[in-house]
From Swiss-Prot:
Pathway: Purine metabolism; GMP biosynthesis; GMP from XMP (L-Gln route): step 1/1. Catalyzes the synthesis of GMP from XMP. This is GMP synthase [glutamine-hydrolyzing]. The lineage of its organism: Bacteria, Pseudomonadati, Pseudomonadota, Gammaproteobacteria, Enterobacterales. Residues 208-400 form the GMPS ATP-PPase domain. It comes from Shigella flexneri serotype 5b (strain 8401).
Length: 525
């Protein structure tokens, strides 16, 4: 019998902050399971979840507005510790008898708070000391409203000149509120505060570790599918690869992976996937060469959204045909991860249980009555990668830059042709190879090459020629919501350009994209 790794759990109520998923990831990093629910949960749902503690997230609303979100009153009656972050502190203060006002001074960015009273939350935690020996904490503020009076049974723990109640606490009830964001790295001791709350105040054990997550997933897969057969669409991406490895460990040859080679993959990618999963790890793989079918369907199409839909539709058709050839398959496995679940949850349901169709499978034929197996649906992307390493997948594969679902279909601008894909594959491979050689690959968040459907004049030997243009793209980003173009060294860019033009016959010009996001997107289509 495997250990119950969900025994100690934290509930995070989401009030809409851009950092809320980061709070959940930080709690997981502390080795404790947590779930992220919309703020409007019911008492019954909270009772059923039985949390060891509750975190109230930040949010963009103003608690001074009449219809702004409120924590369910039961939260404060559940008898468990509560940690309010920014908006979460404000709604806690207001709901428990304090007062919140819109502030004339919006506090955004770095601040230093002075600890004025002892509290279990920050005891022994400091970045510096005042002249008279009081602890100082470097924190990241982001708020317009501020608490102007705390509930009568709370004490002020820390303050700034413009924020008199930067931390408040009721030690007896184990209720804490902070007017800053402990989950971001700019709050230097933020992780220690979260650890203090989760591990010490809530008394949660560190049960959520890669090895234990794998044991738990394997046990749950075996319990769910028994001796039945399972089918999985294997793309070679992180999510489907880790799903394949977990299922293989759990059910062995009862798993069949269908690898659809659509002709839109990176250089030698199909061979690498088949070698690694088939030959090295011994998975049962059905290889479907379908390049001609995809390219025929894409012929003449220039619109990016239409191309995406065509690629998705043809994938589903090919996958369905292969699935129907297999006998007695009862289950479809998908690489759904926790952010997919969160994104798809309707806030009215409170709990994130509505799961969207994963981009790489789609609808199955009506005659195929199959159950769904989603072994990664509780995991964030960084956790999936850690699980992959534990299962023996190579680091370079797990930490590769993101690759779009439609593949080169959206990196060849306009109509997609085999000639264009072949040129792009080779140019992109040179760019990535040089990034790795220069130790720059892991210093940028994403790098790739784009094929431009324009011919440009070039000089080769004594003659002129008109050949194609490619653009190099490299960005630096934390969350992929905004991004800066990467300032790669000129000599490096020159080396890449020379290699592509000399080694890839058919390309005469290389340009570098220096657009940020916004206004541009990271991908060109």
């Amino acid at each position: 019998m495997t250990e119950n790794i969900h025994k100690h759990r934290i509930l995070i109520l989401d009030f809409g902050s851009q950092y809320t998923q980061l709070v959940a990831r930080r709690v997981r990093e502390l080795g404790v399971y947590c779930e992220l629910w919309a703020w409007d949960v019911t008492e019954a749902q909270i009772r059923d979840f039985n949390p060891s503690g509750i975190i109230l997230s930040g949010g963009p609303e103003s608690t001074t507005e009449e219809n702004s979100p409120r924590a369910p009153q039961y939260v404060f009656e559940a008898g468990v510790p509560i940690f309010g972050v920014c908006y979460g502190m404000q709604t806690m203060a207001m709901q428990l008898g304090g007062h919140v006002e819109a502030s004339n001074e919006r506090e955004f960015g770095y601040a230093q708070v002075e600890v004025v009273n002892d509290s279990a939350l920050v005891r022994g935690i400091e970045d510096a000391l005042t002249a008279d020996g009081k602890p100082l904490l470097d924190v990241w503020m982001s708020h317009g409203d501020k608490v102007t009076a705390i509930p009568s049974d709370f004490v002020t723990v820390a303050s700034t000149e413009s924020c008199p109640f930067a931390i408040m606490a009721n030690e007896e009830k184990r209720f804490y509120g902070v007017q800053f964001h402990p989950e971001v790295t700019h709050t230097r001791q933020g992780m220690r505060m979260l650890e203090r709350f989760v591990r010490d105040i809530c008394q949660c054990e560190a049960l959520w570790t890669p090895a234990k997550i794998i044991d738990d997933a394997v046990a749950r897969i075996r319990e769910q599918v028994g001796d039945d057969k399972v089918i999985l669409g294997l793309s070679g991406g992180v999510d489907s690869s880790v799903t394949a490895m977990l299922l293989h460990r759990a059910i062995g040859k009862n798993l069949t992976c269908v690898f659809v080679d659509n002709g839109l993959l990176r250089l030698n990618e199909a061979e690498q996937v088949l070698d690694m999963f088939g030959d090295h790890f011994g998975l049962n793989i059905v290889h479907v060469p379908a390049e001609d079918r995809f390219l025929s369907a894409l012929a003449g199409e220039n619109d990016p959204e239409a191309k995406r839909k065509i690629i998705g539709r043809v994938f589903v058709e090919v996958f369905d045909e292969e699935a129907l050839k297999l006998e007695d398959v009862k289950w479809l496995a998908q690489g759904t991860i926790y952010p997919d679940v969160i994104e798809s949850a309707a806030s009215a349901t409170g709990k994130a249980h509505v799961i969207k169709s994963h981009h790489n499978v789609g609808g199955l034929p009506k005659e195929m009555k199959m159950g769904l197996v989603e072994p990664l649906k509780e995991l964030f992307k960084d956790e999936v990668r850690e699980i992959g390493l534990e299962l023996g997948l190579p680091y370079d594969m797990l930490y590769r830059h993101p690759f779009p679902g439609p593949g080169l279909g959206v990196r060849v601008l306009g109509e997609v042709k085999k000639e264009y894909c072949d040129l792009l594959r080779r140019a992109d491979a040179i760019f990535i190879e040089e990034l790795r050689k220069a130790d720059l690959y892991d210093k940028v968040s994403q790098a790739f090459t784009v094929f431009l459907p324009v011919r440009s004049v070039g000089v080769m030997g004594d003659g002129r020629k008109y050949d194609w243009v490619v653009s190099l793209r490299a960005v630096e980003t934390i969350d992929f919501m905004t991004a800066h173009w990467a300032h790669l060294p000129y000599d490096f860019l020159g080396r890449v350009s020379n290699r592509i033009i000399n080694e890839v016959n058919g390309i005469s010009r290389v340009v570098y994209d220096i657009s940020g996001k916004p206004p541009a997107t990271i991908e060109w289509e």
